[in-house]
């Protein structure tokens, strides 16, 4: 039953870091949520699709996700991204009042996914249905609270056209997966990198290693 995953995948995501604690028992409406977000990072939510599919019923993904998440090395302040705000998709049906925002709710962050230096996809966060503010509002609506420094991710970002997929599962329909030694790079930026203005969000890299090599690096036992 146990063994190496044969369907290792990536998920291109955008994460946000909480800057101001929301105490337990309090909630934040989406229209006010930006005041509690410090900034954004790039996220690779590594996924073992064979394990994930086994776990979906009855409880959903767990071990297929828990083994690794990679995050870009710096947090870009939300204030630096104001000029790249966008409206986002029309939300139908209309969200509940606590999720409603009047101003542009999305961010147009351009993203590229590369494996071993070869770019596989170019995509944007502008099409995300739910914004960071709406995520934070829903996270706190039951009074759960969040702490400064908490990180939350968007889920896989993918576009509607070929070449805008945010995972290998979507791009290759299950015909290609990662192998030991593969290096994945997710790069993010806002604006036009050739004509400007533009802003870099950096990149997040990760190389697949075998279980045996990882145990050796960490100094553990098989």
Language model region names:
Residues 1-138, 176, 207-214:
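Glycine-enriched loop-and-adjacent helix/strand subsegments that border the catalytic/binding cleft
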Residues 141:
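Structured DNA-binding interfaces in DNA transaction proteins
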């Amino acid at each position: 039953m146990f063994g190496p995953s044969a369907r290792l995948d990536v998920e291109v995501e955008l994460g946000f870091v909480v800057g101001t604690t929301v105490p337990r028992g309090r909630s934040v409406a989406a229209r006010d949520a930006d005041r509690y977000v410090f900034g954004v990072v790039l996220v690779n939510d590594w996924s073992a699709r064979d394990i994930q599919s086994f776990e979906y019923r009855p409880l959903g993904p767990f071990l297929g996700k828990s083994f690794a998440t990679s995050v870009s090395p710096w947090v870009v302040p939300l204030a630096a991204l104001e000029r790249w705000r966008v409206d986002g998709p029309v939300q139908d049906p209309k969200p509940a009042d606590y999720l409603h925002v009047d101003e542009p709710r999305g961010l147009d962050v351009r993203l590229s996914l590369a494996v071993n230096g070869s770019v596989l996809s170019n995509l944007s966060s502008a099409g995300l249905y739910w914004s960071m503010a709406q995520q934070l509002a829903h996270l706190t609506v039951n009074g759960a609270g969040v702490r400064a420094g908490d990180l939350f991710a968007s889920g896989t970002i993918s576009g509607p056209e070929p070449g805008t997929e945010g995972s290998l599962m979507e791009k290759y329909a299950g015909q290609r997966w990662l192998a030991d030694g593969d290096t994945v790079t997710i790069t993010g930026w806002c604006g036009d990198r050739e004509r400007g203005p533009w802003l870099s969000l950096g990149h997040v890299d990760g190389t697949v290693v075998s279980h045996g090599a990882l145990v050796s690096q960490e100094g553990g036992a098989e």
